[in-house]
Every structure is written in C-alpha cells, then in structure tokens.
Regions:
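Flexible, solvent-exposed coil segments and beta strand-coil junctions
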Residues: 1, 89-99, 254-263, 312-320, ...
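Outer-membrane beta-barrel biogenesis signature
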Residues: 1-34, 462
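Transmembrane beta-barrel domains of outer membrane proteins
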Residues: 22-25, 116-122, 131, 279-285, ...
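A subset of solvent-exposed loop/turn segments in beta-rich extracellular surface proteins, enriched
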Residues: 26-319
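Extracellular loop and loop/strand-boundary signature of outer-membrane beta-barrel proteins
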Residues: 102-105, 263-269, 318-325, 361-366, ...
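Transmembrane beta-barrel outer-membrane domains
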Residues: 106-114, 271-275, 325-333, 367-371, ...
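Outer membrane beta-barrel transmembrane domains
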Residues: 339, 345-473
Length: 473
C-alpha cells in the first residue's frame, strides 16, 4: 500500500503470493531462507460524501426537531391557539429533515478489507509458499424511494396550504369586521326585498376595504380549491372546527384522497463478495535465460456473494453475516507470474491473476464477474533508493457500488537511518481520473521487520491503512 500498490516487479518473497508468484525467488539476489508474514489492511472509499452527510444528519437532528414542532402544533391546536406560524415551523423542520435525508440517499460507501498469513521459502534457485487470505469487497447505500420523496414534498405543500388558509381566513375576518360585514349583509337583504339600494348601502360602493375583502376572499377560495386536491375538505373542516373539544390534532391521513404507506422508511442496499483464498505458489529460475524466473500460484477459492435490501428501521449489523442474503461458490484458479532482471539495477515483472474467468450469481439473481487481471511493472534500484512503476493491462471489475478501475501505480522507497525504510507512492485510476497518494515506514532487522502503510485522498474521500510483520529464518 505504501508504495502506491506496486510489488509486481520487485518485492520480498513474503509478498510473492499476493503480488507475483515468480518473486518467490529473487533472481538478482538469490535470497534464501524462510519467511512468515501476517498482514492486515483496510480501505474506505466515500466519493459521494456519505459519511459527511451522516455526520450532518446526526448534528442537525432535524428529525427530532420536526417531532417537537409537530407536538407543539398539536398542543396549540388542542387549546384553540393554533396559528400559521406553528404550522410553518413544522414545514421548516420538515424541509430540513427532507434535505438531510436526501444528503444520505443514494450515496454509496465502499469498503474493502483483508487479513491473512503467508509462509515462503527459497533456496536461491527455486522457491515456494503457501498463504491463506480472507478479504471482503463491497459497498452499501441508503435509498429513499421516489414515492417517499413525493410523500414528504406533498406533506410540506399541504402544511404550507393550511398555514396560508389560516392567514387568509384571519385576514378576511379582520376585513369583515372593519367594514361591518354583518350590517352590509342586512342592507343587501333589504335591497333585495325592496328592489332599491338604500343610501347607506350605496355608501359602501367606494369603501376602500371592500376590494381587499373581495381579493382576500378569492385567494382564500383558490387555496381551498388547491387543498381540495389532497383532502376531503368538508370532513376536515368539521374536524378542525371542533379543535377546542379534541385532545389531538386530526389525523390528516384519514382525510387524504390518496393512499400512503403507514411508515416512512428508507432501504439499505448492500452488495459485494466475501472471499477466502488458500493457495500454494511455486517459482523457479530458468537456467537457460539468465535473470528470468517463472512462478505460479494454485489456489482454492470460497466466495460468498452478498446482495440484499432491507428497511433501514429494521436493519441490524447481524444481518451482514446472515446466510439468507448470501450465496456460496467454490472454485479452483491460478495466477501466473514472470520476473526478469535486466541487470543489477532494473527488474521487470508481469502477473496474470485469476486466469480462469468466472461468473457468480447472487441470491437475488444478479451477476458478479471474476475476470483475469494482468499487471506489468518495472523497478529500478540504486544504492538506498528503489523506484517502481506498474500498470494494469486489464480493467478491474467493480464488486460493490464503485465503478470499474484500471490503475497506474508509482512508488519509491528509501533505505535510511538504522535499517528504516521510508516509502511513498501514488495510485492513479486511469479509468475514472482519480488518484490516491500513500506513504509508509518499515523498520527492524534481518530477522524481523514491521511495515506500516497509510493512504489518504481527501479530495476523493478515500482512506486506508495496512500493517504487516515479517519474520525470517
């Protein structure tokens, strides 16, 4: 990890099973002995800033504030003190809650991790090794359905209409009181009987508040017509008029003209693979061609595909390992590797991993492909400095929600003070235009060594770490 993921052209025999089986023998050094290496690595990719949205959701706490504002509206209604501002406070927190939910929805989080153990030995001419590795590659996302999004938006619109109607009704009542509307109604009734408009009635013709009353009444009617698209207004009006005699705000769902789900819930989607590999690798120098080493790894693979969706409110972490969402496959496969030392300073490496292409079906009938992965590398060593460059010749198919990738890796290692090795690198995804820098340090002696690696790319929200120990005999 620390050198950008390089290791195909030049690496210790303890890494051969994972990078290039030909490196079980080091042609330029004739490395001999036995090495044991436990390792652990993890990488998290959050390109859509799901974690940032999650932190904001928790900090903003809009859902709880929505609940509080709704309870406040119910209390005000039950005491005949409900005002439009109470309803608008509900719509304000509802909009914030909706925006926070949208900040979580459909933003995949990709995680990969591995751990295992390798054992290798070399006599300087041939080499072999065994390894066991457990690794998981997958991704997850939370999705708020389009129907639920529409429900939230409709609810906000309805509450805004109710608030506007309250304001409009209040304005109409105030105008009616100003102009003495009850008296005006009486004068109109008298004129209807006598057929003559009295002078008092005629005095209302130019009254400045009559026109605003008419306009406010028309607007109130328009709002009522718009609200009628969502509610059975006659029944709702009767319920609202009895507000002071009820303990609870009317259940608006009872008056809707359309059906809704009982609960608002998001769906969690997870997909990926959980793989156990057990392999044996062999390598040998080719006497007829100086500097050339060939190697192969034969491996048994047990692969569990993970593919499920579940309601977020009912989800628990134990379901990640629930076998009802997994489908197990077994296979034999192999890696082929070549290592060639041009001279004491330059080395070339080529590896093809998983030479047998396979397709695996998930429990939901989807397909996950395992195709061969070819990688070419070159390394240069001089004194205390090592430089490496490697390129994927094939595309790595995505196993979770991440896109397909093809990497160019660059790395450097400097052997410094007291056997410490300082490493740095960068891994560039030529398929998607992203890059991830890395760094690390190794220290120890010929019999034992500890390597630490870190990769972080704030621009693309990617972070990872690795640790491995090596004992030589």
């Amino acid at each position: 990890m620390a050198m950008g993921g390089t290791g195909v052209a030049l690496s210790g025999s303890h890494n051969a099973a994972l990078f290039n089986p030909a490196l079980n023998v080091m042609p330029d050094t004739g490395e001999k002995g036995t090495q044991i290496k436990p390792f652990l690595g993890v990488r998290v990719i959050d390109r859509s800033n799901f974690l940032g949205g999650l932190y904001h959701y928790q900090d903003n706490n809009a859902g709880a504030r929505f609940d509080r504002s709704w309870l406040q509206m119910e209390r005000r209604y039950s005491t005949n003190r409900l005002e439009s501002g109470d309803i608008r406070q509900v719509t304000k927190t509802a909009r914030e809650w909706r925006n926070d939910l949208n900040g979580l929805s459909d933003r995949p989080l990709h995680i990969s991790g591995s751990y295992g153990l390798t054992l290798s030995q070399s006599d300087g001419f041939t080499g072999s090794g065994i390894y066991i590795r457990q690794y998981t590659i997958g991704g997850g996302t939370i999705s708020l359905s389009e129907q639920n999004r529409q429900r939230i938006d409709q609810g906000i619109k309805v509450l805004n209409l109710l608030a506007a109607i309250l304001d409009g009704a209040k304005e109409v009542d105030e105008l009616r009181e100003i102009i003495g509307f009850e008296q005006l109604e009486t004068l109109i009734d008298d004129a209807a009987v006598t057929g003559v408009a009295s002078p008092e009635l005629q005095s209302y013709y130019d009254y400045p508040k009559v026109e605003p009353l008419v306009e406010a009444s028309i607007e109130l009617g328009r709002l009522a017509v718009e609200l009628d698209e969502y509610f059975e207004l006659d029944r709702l009006r009767a319920a609202l008029m009895n507000g002071g005699n009820q303990e609870d705000f009317p259940d608006l769902q009872q008056y809707l003209r359309y059906q809704t789900d009982e609960e608002l819930d998001a769906t969690i989607y997870l997909k990926g693979v959980d793989i156990t590999e057990l392999g044996m690798s062999f390598a040998s120098r080719i006497e007829q061609i100086e500097g050339l080493t060939l190697g192969t790894t034969i491996k048994y693979i047990e692969l569990d595909t993970i593919d499920f969706s579940y309601g977020a409110s009912k989800f628990s972490l134990s379901q990640l390992t629930d076998k009802q969402f997994q489908k197990t496959h077994n296979m034999l496969n192999a890696d082929l590797g070549i290592s060639y030392s041009l001279n004491s300073n330059y080395s070339l490496g080529l590896v093809v991993k998983n030479i047998i292409s396979r397709e695996f079906e998930t429990i939901l009938g989807k397909t996950i492909r395992f195709d061969p992965i070819a990688r070419l590398g070159i390394a240069h060593t001089r004194d205390d400095l090592t430089l490496a460059a490697e390129l994927d010749l094939t595309t790595n198919d995505a196993k979770g929600f991440d896109p397909d990738k093809r990497f160019l890796s660059l790395g450097a290692e400097y052997s410094g003070w007291n056997s410490a090795k300082f490493r740095a690198g960068i891994r560039i995804d030529t398929q998607n235009g992203t890059y991830t820098p890395s760094m690390g340090i190794g220290f120890g002696d010929k019999s034992s060594y500890l390597d630490l690696g870190l990769t972080i790319a704030p621009k693309y929200d990617e972070v990872g770490g690795s640790i491995q120990a090596v004992w030589s005999f």
